[in-house]
Amino acid sequence: MSVDPAHRRQQGRQAPPPPFDAELAGPLDKILADLPMPLTPALVPDRRRRSLAGRLTDEQIRRGGTFETEERTVPGPPGAPPVTLTICRPTAATGPVPVVYHTHGGGMVAGSHRSTELAGELDRAQELDLAVVSVDYRLAPEHPDPAPVEDCYAGLCWLAEHAADEGFDPRRIVLSGNSAGGALAAGLALLTRDRSGPRPAGQLLQFPMLDDRCDTFSAGQMEQVGLWDGLSNRAGWQALLGDRRATPDVSPYAAPARAADVAGLAPAFIEAGSVEALRDDALAYAARIWEAGGEAELHVWSGAFHSFDEWVPDAVVSRAAHHARVAWLRRILDR
């Protein structure tokens, strides 16, 4: 007998959340004291100001000469403005290098191609001698679906077409995103499959927003708990989709959990914290990929909140998450 999804969310509301990791609990309290939750439309300007203030500079990206960086403006989707890419090349590269195509987070409403999470991509790139290309897509609610994912697709197509000229290996492009960026990376994997576009080598989905219906047990359990709680998640989806949210009229390229077919996708790395609203969406998406005969590696970090490693990078669990991502990337790119 099936369980009504709304009932599962209600059950979650009545359940206590899992405990936070001891190294994360104190920092989270300080974060939430400064960063009001849940997200509301009135808070979007504040989130954008914070993101702008935290943008990485060229000097921070170069890391003392480890990378060279440039901004590139490339054609956008048909009839839409051009798309800006930040290109980060390892200066010591001697041949075509693999490249991570980064779609930033920000709940669909904030963030940029130079947001602080780009530092995590550069950490992994520095360890593995990779390039990173980060795309600046249009933001909701001013630019609702499909603008964000189409911008990202336009950037991906340019990257694949010009990879050899840029010193990149077009056969080893990995899609990577955090939170809203995880939704876009997963949506891109579906979109490029269905359009017979560039074929990525993998998709690295960190704490991804996958389902606009927000009807899981964890969505209720963490409705007002932690960073990017269930109420914030609904607000982000509402900004992207408007009145279409939680209706049948939602594209899988916007909300990948809506995909009827997840076969034939690039290998996936999917992760979530045990104390975040998006946890059960990550579990369900990995399970569907396995059921379709696909390849997915799933991690649920015990006691962790949304994007914990960006905020508390020196915690033991944060270092474990970093090592897991690096190990997965190494395996995928060595094939």
Task: Map each language-model feature to its residues.
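A glycine/proline-hinged amphipathic helix-loop "lid/cap" segment
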Residues: 1-87, 334-335
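Short beta-strand element of the alpha/beta-hydrolase
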Residues: 96-106
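Short amphipathic alpha-helix adjacent to the substrate-entry channel of hydrolases
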Residues: 114-133
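Gly/Ser-rich "nucleophile elbow"/oxyanion-hole loop immediately N-terminal to the catalytic nucleophile
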Residues: 161-175, 195
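Alpha/beta-hydrolase active-site loop
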Residues: 143-165, 325
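Hydrolase active-site cap/lid region
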Residues: 190-248
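Short beta-strand/loop motif that positions the catalytic acidic residue
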Residues: 270-272
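Catalytic active-site module of serine/aspartate enzymes centered on a nucleophile-bearing elbow/loop
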Residues: 313-335
